């Protein structure tokens, strides 16, 4: 992906500098250009580098394709209710770059940002200094890998791989695999390993889950029709706390389906509570597995309750669906 060659404005003034050339930075660039505001986008590596280098082979979107709505470039492919795989996501981003031709300068890392003495902001970069009237930070919340400190206590002979570096089951050494965490990445990687026949031990956390489909529609579609995605942080009951919430686990793999850890357990996956300690090759877990599973199920059921209430309140014609208890 390339937006062409742009010269870095060393020592100069730019009305707006956008930091980060991923989907957020590209979207900001589109909106600034539409408003006629001069700007540059500084990307430390290359456009969509994280997508190209820090996703596993079987990666696919969790939300339906129709929800891909980069400004000025909504998804127009043949499968709006499907879930793009990695190569398709990259193709979508490449198409966006070609369509909007953003003023991205690649290979320039911002190392310091401070308020300027004459107003605005001074940026120090690997290509020199620049002054900006305004700065948009679009570097993303997941670009720095987070590894539990307990990992340092594991023996050197045990291979450790961060989710951003995981590619496929075949790349891992033979033997059982312990997956730490049940956010979206942890659950999807655990499923990837499980489907490949690997022995998987999964340390759970408090991440909630959500059903893939309910009462005739993808749950994401229901939430969109209910106005959930138009709710701002300011209007949300949790306020700023909502920014720190863990995303619900579900998958778009093979057409999309629930991720139910209890079902995985019936198929041989070993589930545990939160990882507490490491003593040599022995791992100690909290006694909170049942609470973690029950909590995830409770959130999934509460979302269904909300959908039921909205259907009833608005007289929507939707097929009934059994609410079966957990496995």
How would you name each of these model-derived features?
Residues 2-21, 27-50, 84-327:
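Flavin (primarily FAD) cofactor-binding/catalytic cores of flavoenzymes
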